[in-house]
Amino acid sequence: MMSQTLTLCCLGLVACVYGNTVSTNDTACPTFCPSIYKPVCGTDGQNFKEFASTCNLLSHNCRRERNSVQAYAATDAAWCSSEFVENLHEKLGNFKLEVKECFKPCSMIYQPVCITNGKYRAELANSCLLENFNCALQVSGAQPAELFRLLREEKC
């Protein structure tokens, strides 16, 4: 009885390990993932895609790698959930940017940054402008959740 229990435990462990690995050879890619929605954003360096879970991301990558296609790497969820806008100031209703208490001198050096508030994603000329932008948003009545944060220190 003890050896049967041990055998079943070992088989269960092997099945668990096998089911959670990503295969790049001729064995089948894992196709079963738990029905738990815990979204993960992935990027292949050019595109962004939202997956229902990490398991779904791994399964998708297994199939992509077999076809010699770049795999997706998990990244900040804002890449998948936010809309890229060209003119953020206009999109937010043209609030007043020239607010005296928000004025902070920023260099004229162009070092683009990508920012997001979870809903919108945009580019600013540099990170100093992000502070001025958020201050002006707060003065205009924006809630803390509506403020922007740095997504990456380069173009979106």
Swiss-Prot record:
Record-annotated site: Reactive bond: 35-36, 108-109
GO molecular function, one term: serine-type endopeptidase inhibitor activity
UniProt signal peptide: 1-19
Keyword match Repeat: yes
Matching InterPro entries: Kazal_dom, Kazal_dom_sf
Disulphide linkage map: 29-62, 33-55, 102-135, 106-128, 114-156
Kazal-like domain residues: 23-81, 96-156
Keywords: Disulfide bond, Protease inhibitor, Repeat, Serine protease inhibitor, Signal
CDD domains associated with the record: KAZAL_FS
Protein name: Enhancer of split M1 protein
Protein biosynthesis is among the record's keywords: no
Lineage, broadest ranks: Eukaryota, Metazoa, Ecdysozoa, Arthropoda, Hexapoda
